[in-house]
Amino acid sequence: MFTYYLSNVIYDCFEFTGIQSGNLTHSVESGNRIFIYGAVVLLVAMGSMFFVISLVNKLAIIRKLLRDKEMALDLIARQNEELESREKSITDGLIYAQRIQEARLPSEEFLRNYFPSSFIFFKPKDIVSGDFYWIEEYGDRLFVVAADCTGHGVSGALMSMIGMELIEKAILEDHIIIPSHILAAMNVALEKTFSRKKNIGTIIRDGMDIGICLIDKGRQKIFYSGAFIPLYLLRSNSLNQINGDKILIGMNPDRILYTDHEIDIQEDDMLYMFSDGYVDQFGGKDNKKFMYRRLRYLLLTIHRFDVL
């Protein structure tokens, strides 16, 4: 009796819940599917959440990189402004130094007062130059000097100022008029000027190439002496190269004897003195130096034409 009653109760319960013995297995399978679907949905949701979190982190990193880039660009802009300001200050200083140097150089018109068919070609590479020229009357004679100081730009320009001072002292104050003696006096004076630094352990190895011409128009003669810088004499479609001594001014503490050359002037003679600035220019399709051979050919080609 009790067993029968219990079986009826269980049957009623299954019937109430909609589960009968025939579809019990189906209900379990449906539950499994629901669980799987739920798990999939949960995984998708978690994946989406992780994706969103990763995306947010990446966006944060990108924003930080952009801020860092903006800060770097701002720093670069400020540094560029500072560099431009410094460059302008340096350039302004060099331009002012150029005016000082040019004020010390004689004008081309001054030379043309003596030699109408003459010219000066002076084109500094770095605003100021280590090359210089010097022209001065001495009685009825004329000194013409061309020089190339060691160093470039500012250092060469400072050396050129020293060089002009030494020339003026030798000729105008000490009245040394023989070109070779002027070079010897300059060599000693320049070496003494820089030897003062030797006492503190610093040896300055600076000097200059230089050529000096003393032109005596009354006697129709030129007296030339040089240290490395040559004198070119063009006459009757030929070029005569008169070389200076290979002894740099200021680099030899001993009393050096330089060589004098005496030249008789003839009508239509053309004389050139120059530094190595022109021949050291690079150019052409192979970007090679101009060199002395091309310069000699150029001078032979143009010397028949009027200078002006």
Language-model region placement:
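… and, occasionally, acidic/histidine-rich disordered N-termini of signaling adaptors
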Residues: 74-271
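Structural motif marking the loop-to-transmembrane transition
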Residues: 27-35, 39, 101
